[in-house]
Amino acid sequence: YLVNPAAYAALGAYMFLLILIGFPVNFLTLYVTIEHKKLRTPLNYILLNLAVANLFMVLGGFTTTMYTSMHGYFVLGRLGCNLEGFFATMGGEIALWSLVVLAIERWIVVCKPISNFRFTEDHAIMGLAFTWVMALSCAVPPLVGWSRYIPEGMQCSCGVDYYTRAEGFNNESFVIYMFIVHFLTPLIIISFCYGRLLCAVKEAAAAQQESETTQRAEREVSRMVVMMVISFLMCWLPYASVAWYIFCNQGSEFGPIFMTLPAFFAKSSAIYNPLIYICMNKQFRHCMI
């Protein structure tokens, strides 16, 4: 054991709790949306994509981590590490790029930079394809030799190798690529879209250009998406910051808890988005009941 055995027991219990909550709420989101025709809107396609991403993390990542934490180290070997790292990275990236597509959709619908533009089913499907392509471009390279997945923190789950300059893996270039393309770029796009969105909502309220009902509906959707973005960032910013710090200080001593806490806090994002969706979407709640 790298740390006190009680820490592994606590980790296993935490992962069990995430599975216990994460699987039903994400499955419920999928089931209710597919069952009720009126919920099958282009916007909800992206929200469904988020639920699929979360199920990736729950089924492919959380179950593995719960099992390995019972043993006190990653017992599933190289193949298991690759699979767990892939599913966790894939789920997190699909969720992040889904939030980017949602932010762009909100910007186009509310701010109307393109006159007479409607966000249709075709646009939603293109958005879905885009999220998967971007997620794969982040999760696949470590499987084929550009960086690698290794056990991290308490050695119960696997992630990208921020820790070493292992020969032949080009870890440095991959980590820089990952931070610029798969972290900073989405953050900049989301920040731009919501900056414009806030201005547009204020201007529309002042000018009373649209009916009160339309404005209220758009505000509710925008509020829900903003909450999803904030909760996602609260979960993932600590992990990204610690990973970058470790990458910039390779060779220094880091305790196993140092990376484990933010990594497992990040995993809780799999339950936040569906809960926000269920709590803040009246139409969904009515269909669920």
UniProtKB/Swiss-Prot annotation:
Phosphorylated on some or all of the serine and threonine residues present in the C-terminal region. Gene3D superfamilies: Rhodopsin 7-helix transmembrane proteins. One of its GO terms (cellular component) is plasma membrane. Signal peptide: none annotated. The modification N6-(retinylidene)lysine is found at residue 267. One of its GO terms (biological process) is visual perception. A motif ('Ionic lock' involved in activated form stabilization) lies at residues 105-107. Glycans are attached at residue 171. It is a multi-pass membrane protein. The record marks 84 as: Plays an important role in the conformation switch to the active conformation. The chain crosses the membrane at residues 8-32, 45-67, 82-104, 124-144, 174-195, 224-245, 258-279. This is Rhodopsin. The keyword tRNA-binding does not apply. It comes from the Eukaryota. Residues 1-7, 68-81, 145-173, 246-257 are extracellular. The gene is rho. Photoreceptor required for image-forming vision at low light intensity. While most salt water fish species use retinal as chromophore, most freshwater fish use 3-dehydroretinal, or a mixture of retinal and 3-dehydroretinal. Light-induced isomerization of 11-cis to all-trans retinal triggers a conformational change that activates signaling via G-proteins. Subsequent receptor phosphorylation mediates displacement of the bound G-protein alpha subunit by arrestin and terminates signaling.
